[in-house]
Amino acid sequence: MNPATDPVSAAAAALAPPPQPPQPHRLSTSCNRHPEERFTGFCPSCLCERLSVLDQTNNGGSSSSSKKPPTISAAALKALFKPSGNNGVGGVNTNGNGRVKPGFFPELRRTKSFSASKNNEGFSGVFEPQRRSCDVRLRSSLWNLFSQDEQRNLPSNVTGGEIDVEPRKSSVAEPVLEVNDEGEAESDDEELEEEEEEDYVEAGDFEILNDSGELMREKSDEIVEVREEIEEAVKPTKGLSEEELKPIKDYIDLDSQTKKPSVRRSFWSAASVFSKKLQKWRQNQKMKKRRNGGDHRPGSARLPVEKPIGRQLRDTQSEIADYGYGRRSCDTDPRFSLDAGRFSLDAGRFSVDIGRISLDDPRYSFDEPRASWDGSLIGRTMFPPAARAPPPPSMLSVVEDAPPPVHRHVTRADMQFPVEEPAPPPPVVNQTNGVSDPVIIPGGSIQTRDYYTDSSSRRRKSLDRSSSSMRKTAAAVVADMDEPKLSVSSAISIDAYSGSLRDNNNYAVETADNGSFREPAMMIGDRKVNSNDNNKKSRRWGKWSILGLIYRKSVNKYEEEEEEEEDRYRRLNGGMVERSLSESWPELRNGGGGGGGPRMVRSNSNVSWRSSGGGSARKVNGLDRRNKSSRYSPKNGENGMLKFYLPHMKASRRMSGTGGAGGGGGGGWANSHGHSIARSVMRLY
């Protein structure tokens, strides 16, 4: 069908539609059956075809004039759904011959699509079944609602070529009445929806005005009936709206009356909750009384039957511990549920489980008697003396070594500590007279006497270590004395440490009448004595006065080389007294003539005195030994201390000059030679 062939459709196309409110921007789409059409939503051509099918089914036997409304409705729908971009051809024309009623276009809404086979089976093969995606109703925006409200408030009759606006009812614009009954409200909503569908399905309900102002009405009989029903339904709503206008006081009274029953209900609900809690609390109290009223005596084996499987709330536990089902350190109730199953299965273990139950209760103790620090017994009131367990062995001091195998225990009457009978002390024989002397043991108690009289294996190792350390120190001293590198200063210091009383640690070297030297008995080492009769080497043992330790002699190659070197140097500087920088400087006394045996007394210094009378050479090196750090050599002047060559006293020079038989001229030569060297080197005279 072509709308341009019909004069009525041409006039409708010439009419300009009223200005529509701006719609939100939507993307335009095209239809597969009508690719040239651009629209938003669904295709208007397809909609016109559907409406034409409906008109043909409803008005199949009517005249040709009755078929005009579908063509007009198709033109109106195309004008509505096409994008308004071509205003020159079919756009807005306010000065046309006729105008379409403005209240018509906002009222158009989509309806549910259905197949043509429902109405007429003859058209089932012509039209395809429609998709249900196009059945969604278009939502009315807020702008459309405002425009509908403005149109509804306009005057109903306008003359002079104006548009006659008839008020129409819309479910969106009209207020919805609140009904207390939900069933009635649902039924009313369904009826209103059916009325809306019937109202908006009829698309031929519109009015057109001519130039002369005559109204051209094109409507069917069914449309008139629908309007009458709607108008009849509107009248009672207006009456209800007038009746609802009441003062505020009435609303307050009504609200108070409605709230009173709710308060009553809340009170009864709170009372019921409180009664339930009170009932639970009473039940818990009864369970506690039953549990605490049981017999908790140690000898009782009766179990509380009322105790449930789950653990009950204890007085010393919190609610968190109840949910954790774990035992706390502050539990006071015994546990019966764990061992209850064993009573029925194993009768032989019945007594053992009873003991476990009683031991699990901290208020009753079945511990065995044990010794405490003060000697009392713990738990001895629970059993008679005959039923008590034997006490544990006594707590002895820490013994690192194994104790002796034989012990004589004496059982005490109070059953507390075993006591060892003290063994008689062994007799000690005095070595001086061979008579056994009584042993005096320190300490007044038996334990200290046992400690001192017992063997060293029973003593603590701390004292053994201390005594062994003393022995090791003494052995080290002996080893140091045996070494050939020991000096006289170290020997004298050891002698002073040992406690020997000597006059300023001095020793005398005396000359006999025959020219030989007599040495004290404490001098250690080799002695080479050269006499006029024979050249013999006398070797004898030195000994310590206090310690009583005998040291063997030790002659080393190193000593011999050192002594030979010193002898060689003394021959060059004969008769000189050699001193180190650290040595003391006492006066040297030479009494008597050369044969009279001069006497020299020395202090804490190393003295090497040589007599050159009668060709006899005597080397005294009893304690003339030096360490590696202090020994010196004529070849190595940097190693060791410097040597000062000093002369004898004047008296000794004079005596040596007038020397007797043993002196000779050798002594004067040595003294004069030493004096000349001292004068030339030291510049002292």
From Swiss-Prot:
Classification via Pfam families: DUF740
Consequence recorded when altering residue 318 to E: Slightly reduced activity. Normal plasma membrane localization. Complements the ops mutant
Cellular compartment(s): Cell membrane; Cytoplasm
Disruption phenotype annotation: Short roots associated with both reduced cell division in the root meristem and altered root cell elongation. Early emergence of lateral roots at the root-hypocotyl junction. Reductions in the complexity of vascular networks in cotyledons and discontinuous phloem differentiation. Impaired primary root protophloem differentiation during root development leading to altered phloem long-distance transport. The double mutant vcc ops exhibits a complete loss of high-complexity vascular networks.
Main subcellular location of this protein, as a coarse class: membrane
Biased composition (Acidic residues): 179-202
Compositionally biased spans, kind Basic residues: 280-291
Positions of modified residues (Phosphoserine): 318
Effect upon mutating residue 319 to K: Gain-of-function allele that partially rescues roots defects phenotype associated with the lack of BRX. Normal plasma membrane localization. Complements the ops and brx mutants. Strongly increased activity
GO biological process, one term: cotyledon vascular tissue pattern formation
Family listed: Belongs to the OCTOPUS family.
PANTHER family (alphabetical): PROTEIN OCTOPUS, PROTEIN: UPF0503-LIKE PROTEIN, PUTATIVE (DUF740)-RELATED
Protein name, entry field: Protein OCTOPUS
Organism: Arabidopsis thaliana (Mouse-ear cress)
